[in-house]
Amino acid sequence: MVLDKKTIAMASGANYAAFTTLFKDGSPQTHIMWVDTDGEYLLINTEIHRAKYLNTTNDKRVNVMIWKHDDTFKFVEVRGKVVDEIQGEEAFENIQSLSNKYWNKPYPFPVQTERIVLKIEAEREFFFNLKDEDFDF
């Protein structure tokens, strides 16, 4: 499924996301995350020792809800699945880019294991109070 231009705009801006994965027993786990996009997929950067990553090795289904930083009643919910991963230098460069996007400075924390970017393919998108007029396309 091709991402809607509103979803691309939300993921490209400094808007936070609630990222939900599933434990082996099916119970959900949600974290507030930085989010990105390559125009085709949503991108979530984490480390390989984190539960959110380990959960996706067992169950690829995820949910990403991105809200506007200046109006939390405007958001998009994306239901999808992890279809690929980016590792190594490209994943490290992505966390630096995200840190600059959200904090205007380099990523300040040490990497404990290895950075990884989860590529998420959208299966459904739901919009709440988001209109094309909310963006400069």
Regions found by a protein language model. Give the residues of each.
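A short beta-turn/loop motif at secondary-structure boundaries
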Residues: D25-S27, H69-T72, V111-Q112
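Short, surface-exposed beta-strand-loop junctions and turns on beta-sheet-rich folds
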Residues: R50-K52, D71, D134-D136
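Short, solvent-exposed aromatic-acidic interface loops
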Residues: I48-A51, Y102
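Short secondary-structure boundary/capping segments
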Residues: I8-A9, W34, L54, Y107-P110
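Extreme N-terminal tail/first-helix region
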Residues: M1-A17, F137
